[in-house]
Amino acid sequence: MNICLGIITSPHGIKGAVKIKTFTEKPENIFLYGELISGSENYKISLVSVVSNNLVIATISGVNSRNEAELLRNKKLYIERNKLPQLNDEDEFYQNDLVNMEVRLESNELYGYVKSVHNFGSGDILEILVISTKKNIMLSFTKEIFPYINMKERYIVINMPEFIGQ
């Protein structure tokens, strides 16, 4: 299984550098894992600078012009799961681990499933497919709203009585 560590958002300058939105804890961590994978291609990336808490400017081996960099726009960059560090704390997990987990009410009743995890800049958001309505909702991924995660049995508990009609 591959884990997405970032996405190339746009070229930067005329010499082939790119901007990469990172999904790592620290933006510079995307450079710790060697070559990254996108489809059948491998990319060796090097840090130019950290722009913000989730954006870096990087060069890619073999990409030497803005036109070449433009062809990489929106490419997702992956790493093999087994290359990521083992997590020791039960409160630690990779965002990708949440996808397809059951979402249960505090009464243990099935509420829905996690479709994906997003971050638009202000924190993580879970996209949940609600079973009863067959619609997707997005909720801030906070300890108050999701007080318990059971990684072994693959479910999370939602605590929002005013939102879910309890």
From Swiss-Prot:
**Pfam families attached here?**
PRC, RimM
Where does the record place the PRC barrel domain? 90-164
Function of the molecule: An accessory protein needed during the final step in the assembly of 30S ribosomal subunit, possibly for assembly of the head region. Essential for efficient processing of 16S rRNA. May be needed both before and after RbfA during the maturation of 16S rRNA. It has affinity for free ribosomal 30S subunits but not for 70S ribosomes.
Look up keyword tRNA processing and say if it applies: no
Q: State the superkingdom.
A: Bacteria
Q: Which GO terms describe its molecular function?
A: ribosome binding
Task: Indicate the transmembrane segments per the record.
Answer: none
User: Keyword set for this entry?
Assistant: Chaperone, Cytoplasm, Ribosome biogenesis, rRNA processing
Q: Name one GO biological process term.
A: rRNA processing
Q: What is this protein called?
A: Ribosome maturation factor RimM
What is recorded about the domains? The PRC barrel domain binds ribosomal protein uS19.
Database matches in Gene3D superfamilies: PRC-barrel domain, RimM
Gene expressing this chain: rimM
- Record carries keyword Cytoplasm: yes
Which SUPFAM superfamilies does the UniProt record give? PRC-barrel domain (SSF50346), Translation proteins (SSF50447)
Q: Which family does it belong to?
A: Belongs to the RimM family.
**Where in the cell?**
Cytoplasm
GO cellular component entries? cytoplasm; ribosome
Subunit comment for this entry?
Binds ribosomal protein uS19.
